[in-house]
Curated annotation (Swiss-Prot):
One of its GO terms (biological process) is mitochondrial electron transport, ubiquinol to cytochrome c. Heme b b562 binds at residues 83, 182. Heme b b566 binds at residues 97, 196. The lineage of its organism: Eukaryota, Metazoa, Chordata, Craniata, Vertebrata. It is found in: Mitochondrion inner membrane. A ubiquinone binds at residue 201. The chain crosses the membrane at residues 33-53, 77-98, 113-133, 178-198, 226-246, 288-308, 320-340, 347-367. The gene is MT-CYB. Its cofactor is heme b. This is Cytochrome b.
């Protein structure tokens, strides 16, 4: 008799995706981050659901409702900090996942890659709107500054901003709609994840060598399920440590001050995971130029497959490209640091230099080095 997991209409889909899925035998720990992101999404949806049961999306009570969750709800403090720091873990895994794709040439699976970019935008939008909900000083002013950027769009900009605000400033209508979208978007993200996996399973996984691995495949279960579970344990240990020992380490102290439209904080900045893009935005003195640079800092990922001119897919055997890749990583760390600094000398010039380097490495230096490597290998 055939096993039920192979015949049942629903179970056989799960079986072909997570049990009998043929996977390359050489996948390293860098391939763990996809499953870790799935766990992060699950944790965020679950904790968010319970938080939404106690949260009120009204400017008069939003801040107090978060205080009530932390003080009066059973384990409310744990839910709140798991959700806030879970977002940080989500972005750490997300950036490592994208970095893995860039390093090993996974972007040549263009459908999977493009859905991934859509997912990145959706998760960033969700995180931004979530940051507004506690209605602290940084929530209010962050929302004001970032939504105001849309006014740089010619002709329709001002009307667009007022339409998003639901009035002439960030107020009750803005908070209510942000809560609605913050609740809805994770489910859209979950649907996009299904599409992401669907396209991935059409081609099969890439591997560290970048060489087709069809002759050497192993079943996903038990080999990679055990490996993924180890990843879950490490990540959940790190998240628990962060939540239980220093829950406010990655947050901003200004967000413990209730939102006040009459008092601007000295340094308005987003959460740490957006600081690199914020630094790129600030490094251009022109408003529209800054907004375009901000969007392009993420959208540039979509043109990476077009710029792939190397005869080898992975960077595993390309030391010159590896040097450039790690230079790009250090530039991103520099931008993240600059994004959290005030706009003054020498931070302005460091930010501008790092921004130019960021685009230069991806658009010019990477393809140029790939061509040089091709010549060195007489290809």
């Amino acid at each position: 008799m055939t096993n039920i997991r192979k015949t049942h209409p629903l179970l056989k889909i799960i079986n072909s995706s997570f049990v009998d899925l043929p996977a390359p035998s050489s996948l390293s720990s860098w391939w763990n981050f996809g499953s870790l992101l799935g766990v992060c999404l699950g944790v965020q949806i679950l904790t968010g659901l319970f938080l939404a049961m106690h949260y009120t999306s009204d400017t008069a009570t939003a801040f107090n409702s978060v205080t009530h969750i932390c003080r009066d709800v059973n384990y409310g403090w744990l839910l709140r900090y798991l959700h806030a720091n879970g977002a940080s873990m989500f972005f750490i895994c997300l950036y490592l996942h994208v970095g893995r794709g860039l390093y090993y040439g996974s972007y040549t699976y263009s459908e999977t890659w493009n859905i991934g970019i859509l997912l990145l935008f959706a998760v960033m939008a969700t995180a931004f709107m979530g940051y507004v909900l506690p209605w602290g000083q940084m929530s209010f002013w962050g929302a004001t500054v970032i939504t105001n950027l849309l006014s740089a769009i010619p002709y329709i900009g001002t009307d667009l901003v007022q339409w998003i605000w639901g009035g002439f400033s960030v107020d009750k209508a803005t908070l209510t709609r942000f809560f609605a979208f913050h609740f809805l978007l994770p489910f859209i993200v979950a649907a996009l994840v299904m599409v992401h996996l669907l396209f991935l399973h059409e081609t099969g996984s890439n591997n560290p060598t970048g060489i087709p691995s069809d002759p050497d495949m192993i079943p996903f279960h038990p080999y990679y399920t055990i490996k993924d579970i180890l990843g879950f344990l490490i990540m959940l240990t790190a998240l628990s440590t962060l939540v239980l020992f220093s829950p406010d380490l990655l947050g901003d102290p200004d967000n413990y001050i209730p939102a006040n439209p009459l008092n601007t904080p000295p340094h308005i900045k987003p959460e740490w995971y957006f600081l690199f893009a914020y630094a790129i935005l600030r490094s251009i003195p022109n408003k529209l130029g800054g907004v375009l640079a901000l969007v392009m800092s993420i959208l540039i990922l979509a043109i990476v497959p077009v710029l792939h001119v190397s005869k080898q897919r992975s960077m595993m055997f390309r030391p010159l490209s590896q040097c450039l890749f790690w230079l790009l990583v250090s530039v991103l760390f520099t931008l993240t640091w600059i994004g959290g600094q005030p706009v003054e000398h020498p931070y302005i010039i460091i930010g501008q230099t790092a921004s130019v380097l960021y685009f230069l490495i991806i658009l010019v230096l990477m393809p140029a080095i790939s061509l040089i490597e091709n010549r060195l290998l007489k290809w």
